[in-house]
Regions:
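Carboxylate-rich, polar loop motifs that coordinate divalent cations or form catalytic acidic clusters
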Residues: 1-386
Length: 386
């Protein structure tokens, strides 16, 4: 006995089937003149993939001919006029968002920071597209740009984000620091003035951090500022003579400042003690490079530093750093994100899944990533696990 599926007369069929391949148990990939179908032989449900210029990474041509699966599980799809398409076995692990003029999308293509508010909304800093807000619930983007009226973002080049209750602190390049009240939707801008010592010590900020004592630390291109809540102004703490692009706090209350060119600075606010950790070719157990992109204190209290030349781990007993040997395409570690004791490292040549003491797995564009290159600190582990 034979059964016919997907007959064109049913109104949901396909014409001119060229190839069949088992994708998974009870699932077939079907190549046709209408595109690529994923068909469930038990439920008779199917999903059609076809060419669509408005959808990133869609099929290059709807006329699908040969389909094969390689030894690694990758799917190769030949088309009539669109060349070859490839689906990585890891493709469904990553979801991409990119700017489009045709449908609701993120504004900007250069993404530098993420921040999550109490309602689960993701705030996104962009170099070229201002501030974005993404709602995972309805999958919609809203963006904020400078406007002629005063109640707007001061500049479109955004680099730092930090939540403080209902206030979102926003660091910009040359536009000062903005504070957006999420309840009222109003912006307040803090700037630098040479004749006002209680103003910020610079016009640009790449890192803003709220510590466990609810203090707000604002890093400029040169130094560190502490927000004075009572006076609504700033205390200029120290000129580091370097741009700070990340801040974190360890279990002992020390603040760690990652700088571009001057290594790591450790500061204890109560004891007012500073210490600088730098790379030294003549000494063992120093930082791998003085350009430190990021710092993470993990759930075990371990301190990790991502540098331009490798991943480093702090030895608390010896008060020094060891460089972790990793077999990865690029040792320029841009950010470190922890998820269930696994470290995710973004680099300039892909995303690395690293289990300390075990090994690495590298993901690239062929695995579904939008790009192999990441900016420093452009990553977040959101409350929904993504």
């Amino acid at each position: 006995q034979t059964t016919t599926y997907l007959h064109p007369t049913d109104g949901k069929g396909v014409t001119h089937i060229h190839s069949l391949m088992e994708y998974a148990p009870h699932q077939l990939l079907i190549g046709s003149d209408d595109g690529l179908l994923l068909f469930n032989t038990l439920t008779e449900e199917y999903k059609l993939f076809t060419e669509n210029e408005t959808v990133p990474n869609s099929l290059s041509n709807r006329f699908v001919y040969p389909i094969i699966k390689d030894r690694e599980g990758g799917i190769w799809i030949g088309t009539y006029y669109g060349g070859i398409n490839y689906i990585s076995p890891n493709a469904e692990q990553f979801e991409s968002f990119s700017h489009s003029r045709l449908y609701n999308s993120i504004n900007g293509n250069v993404i530098g920071r993420f921040c999550e508010d109490a309602h689960g909304q993701i705030w996104i800093a962009s170099d070229d597209g201002g501030l974005n807000r993404y709602s995972p619930k309805d999958r919609k983007f809203v963006y904020y740009l400078p406007a002629d009226h005063k109640n707007s973002l001061s500049y479109h080049n955004v680099h730092a984000l930090c939540m403080d209750g209902d206030n979102l602190w926003i660091g910009t390049y040359t536009g000062g620091v903005n504070v957006l009240n999420l309840q009222t939707g109003t912006f307040k801008v803090y700037r630098s003035y040479t004749d006002i010592p209680t103003s910020l010590d610079g016009t640009s900020s790449y890192a803003i951090f709220k510590d466990r004592s609810d203090r707000i630390w604002v890093a400029s291109m040169n130094g560190i500022n502490l927000y004075n809540r009572e006076e609504d102004n700033f205390i200029r703490i120290k000129n580091l003579d370097a741009m700070t692009i990340d801040i974190d706090q360890d279990t002992k209350g020390n603040l760690w400042f990652s700088t571009q060119g001057k290594g790591l600075f450790k500061f204890h606010p109560e004891k007012q003690i500073w210490k600088n950790y730098v790379h030294n070719n003549t000494l063992p157990n120093t930082l791998a490079n003085n350009q430190v992109n990021c710092c993470l204190i993990d759930s075990h209290g371990e301190i990790w530093a991502g540098t331009m030349n490798g991943l480093c781990k702090y030895n608390i007993e010896e008060d020094n750093f060891e460089t972790i040997p990793l077999e990865i395409p690029s040792h320029n570690i841009c950010s470190i994100i922890e998820d269930q004791h696994i470290l995710w490292l973004t680099t300039t040549k892909g995303l690395v899944r690293y289990i300390p003491g075990e090994g690495c797995q590298v993901f690239t564009k062929s695995d579904g990533l939008q790009s192999d290159q990441f900016l420093p600190n452009a990553g977040i582990n959101a409350s929904d696990g993504k």
